[in-house]
Amino acid sequence: MRKKRILFCGEATYLNTGYATYLREVMKVLYATQKYEIAEFASYGKDGDPRGVDIPWKFYGNLPTKDSQQQQYDEIPTNQFGEWKFESVLLDFLPDIVCDIRDFWMFEYQERSAFRPYFNWVIMPTVDAAPQNEQWLSTFCNADGVFNYSQWGHEVLEKESNGNIKCLGSAPPSADAAYQPVQDKNQHKINMGFSPSTKFIGTVMRNQRRKLFPDLFDAYRKFLETSGRNDVYLYCHTSYPDLGWDIPKLLNKYKIASKTLFTYSCADCNSSFPAFFSDAKRKCKICGSKNAGLASVQKGASYQYLSSIMNMFDLYIQYANSEGFGLPQVEAAACGVPVMSIDYSAMSSVIRNLGGTPLKVKTLYSELETGCDRAVPDNDYTAEKMKEFFDKSEQEINTLSKNTRLNFEKYYQWDKTAKKWEDYFDSVDIKPFEQTWGSLPRLHQPQPQTKTEMSSSE
């Protein structure tokens, strides 16, 4: 019996984005089984890119390789997600199964493909809020299988589709192997340039509207005022400038510029380092060039350095109005850092699995663009929980840290997640090739005109 042919659609697995990481780790496990013929259709990936040389499976880059293709690529926004090349990739690889793990608008074109009857379609959308848009639910209903990033998302789709979506449970991501606890946290802080007595509340979030930096800064300001602590700093691994918040304006508004650190990455020497905010560009501490900027997806820190940052944190906090998953929570837990998250969307599932602290939601509001409910956090409650955490003894915090790591090992492991995909792929009965890609062309001939002249009534 021939091997099943599986096409994974997502972001190029040599990138360090969340989607890329998920596909890379799952595909590595599945490829090692030697049970399937595997291919990757990579958004933001390019054929011939040297970063893809070591990829062992078949690779289809989505970016144009010729100047003549650029105009076609730029015509439709969804081409960046693969719409313009999808069918040519299908005709070359002839998959039995097509898999996509992204947002609805990144894969909905696959449902519209003329070749849809020829492949089993399994998706894992980022269900980050409720209620879900009716168009999204309709598309999910037409998939052959639907995984979810979280148990919360699974329950939302089950409820809102009245059981009509073929939900397969959750298949959550894990952290990269680089995220490990350090043996001596105090020495690690010294190595990173800080006093061992310095405490950190840390967050790793992109500078987007749904990441609630204004509320986080407000809660942290209130914590400083109510606790009287001067040894606890806020560390934000985020980008600026971006399409999100005006970070320097917020720092000034809440008077925390001298208490908040960021990660800068140098475009010249590729080094990263922590520093207080000093504009979008600053002098690199490593090589001295003036080309260091706040870390971003395009110019970011390595997993190894991000792990070093995470291991400085005493407490990790995820402060967003909604999350499809919120991977940094799990990455922090992998480093043994206790976690707090807003008690809404996927964060509700993750924070309970990790044994962390759910942060109270003050209210929900309906978002204009999507009709989904988004969370407004209770910043006073968050400030109170921050104070309670840092009032704990060192022994209590160490116990929390160990339990957080144990919960990470229990709930978030790549081999367990890949096994869920493997079990699904093995359960799919593939149709004979002659009924799909090898089927005869369906040619529709128009009715031949039998008269040279016809009346209007005819």
What are these regions (language model features)?
Residues 388, 395-411:
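A short, well-ordered alpha-helix in the C-terminal region of glycosyltransferases
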